[in-house]
Amino acid sequence: MAKSDGDDPLRPASPRLRSSRRHSLRYSAYTGGPDPLAPPVDLRDALEQIGQDVMAGASPRRALSELLRRGTRNLTGADRLAAEVNRRRRELLRRNNLDGTLQEIKKLLDEAVLAERKELARALDDDARFAELQLDALPASPAKAVQELAEYRWRSGQAREKYEQIKDLLGRELLDQRFAGMKQALAGATDDDRRRVTEMLDDLNDLLDKHARGEDTQRDFDEFMTKHGEFFPENPRNVEELLDSLAKRAAAAQRFRNSLSQEQRDELDALAQQAFGSPALMRALDRLDAHLQAARPGEDWTGSQQFSGDNPFGMGEGTQALADIAELEQLAEQLSQSYPGASMDDVDLDALARQLGDQAAVDARTLAELERALVNQGFLDRGSDGQWRLSPKAMRRLGETALRDVAQQLSGRHGERDHRRAGAAGELTGATRPWQFGDTEPWHVARTLTNAVLRQAAAVHDRIRITVEDVEVAETETRTQAAVALLVDTSFSMVMENRWLPMKRTALALHHLVCTRFRSDALQIIAFGRYARTVTAAELTGLAGVYEQGTNLHHALALAGRHLRRHAGAQPVVLVVTDGEPTAHLEDFDGDGTSVFFDYPPHPRTIAHTVRGFDDMARLGAQVTIFRLGSDPGLARFIDQVARRVQGRVVVPDLDGLGAAVVGDYLRFRRR
């Protein structure tokens, strides 16, 4: 329920009401719009989908566009909304046709002629026989028949009424094409009503004449609206807004005409001259159309549609259908988001609500809010090159998600360390305990003072006195530091065999684990293809697969050695994820480091250089684990031999278990 007073449905109606009747509030039914009680947009699912697409090789901008197109588990995407828009358009064309006015005129004409024949059959004079001959000679064309009957002297009052209805219907249909709702509004209209319509058209054309010459003023417009505002429910605020609304409707009327067959156009053109019994209305509308086409040449005045259904539309209904179709086509383009600079804010929510209902507009508004929220809450930002990128906050969230999935696979193993002792050099655990003789941990000041205050609460003292019994210390734990090198294969085979995304999620999970639970550890991610290079988690996430020859594990091991030597006091760990034999190495790493030798099958020199790299890891005391992906027998033989040589381990996980295998191995080392 929402209150009827004020714009805010949850706010008291006015300060005066609140002061005079402090506890009195008035409520009325909720009238639509955004749900004021709806929960905020959930970004977790959205960010996870964007991260998946970025890791698969899409840019953040492209990933966001794909998310908006697909939607989420709980939110309809733009593609589905566009499909509904296109379905509605096809339905309008398939179910309806534009013969309604001609069919209705023919029906009224037949009824008028039949009633007149019945009246003539009862008459015995010669004039009645002559009148029957006139009716027999009427042409088959309804337009020509109506024209010939213009001077006919009707004997039947019922027949005369039917014939007058034809002229009245034509006038109302022509006006309904330009002013929505006129057909119903003028049903049973009097001559005075028709005179007011004619006067409105004359005044409107005069106003547009002045506007075309640049002589109109806001006062002219205000006077016109004061006099004729009832004909314009859109309530335009100036001449430009008036032109916008009139031109859209007039362009739809022109497309209605373009969609007719030549025979239908000829019939309606001839009939239009009889609207309201004279050609004056048609002349006024032609003058109005000329003004609108000159003022708004960008409207679609030449388009047409092919209707193929059985439901007949009149001129006004057909014009509205064509206006709806144009609006639907515009919505389809907006929802496609396929043009430069596209944004969900471009979608006309009012038009979407008119065509598909309020829920569709709510869904589109939520998509736009989702797009803004990802930027405003810091998950997307722009780099120095102006390109969108995932922010550090987004990377932390993606790492958290990846680690959560890995933790579920590890079945509750938490990786606690066994080396835990109190000491000033340790890291705070968040716990406190009473001080004991020999403790070197820092005092926890807040707990110490609280104990002293509570102990002396019953006594009155000018100052707080602290005793040994009050002192509590902050508990710490000593953490053994590790230097971890994660070597991930980024050769093109990883992309081709669908190992790209699991590899990236594995790296993200390990990175997040180290950054949040083992902050003293030094993790270095090294990506190796034809060359090897150190990368951040964000760089690896956005790394695109590139077709290039070479799996240069030798270069990666050399970079890992540098990392381990920089952290000589830490326990060294080397984790290698690869799906192929080493096929490249650096010939002159100590020189310029740019000369790559490639050969397939692997050249003995490449094997020798790579083995020496593993030997170097062993000399540094590194715990080496190799995660072999795929079933390449050559890789299996090489990895098994190397692992025995350096006393390392070989793990052969499936793709779904890669993250759990790598993180689990790291935790196994940390528990030792």
Swiss-Prot record:
Signal peptide: none annotated. SMART domains: VWA. GO terms for cellular component: plasma membrane. InterPro entries: VWF_A, vWFA_dom_sf. Residues 1-10 have a biased composition (Basic and acidic residues). Residues 1-41 are annotated as: Disordered. This is Uncharacterized protein Rv0959.
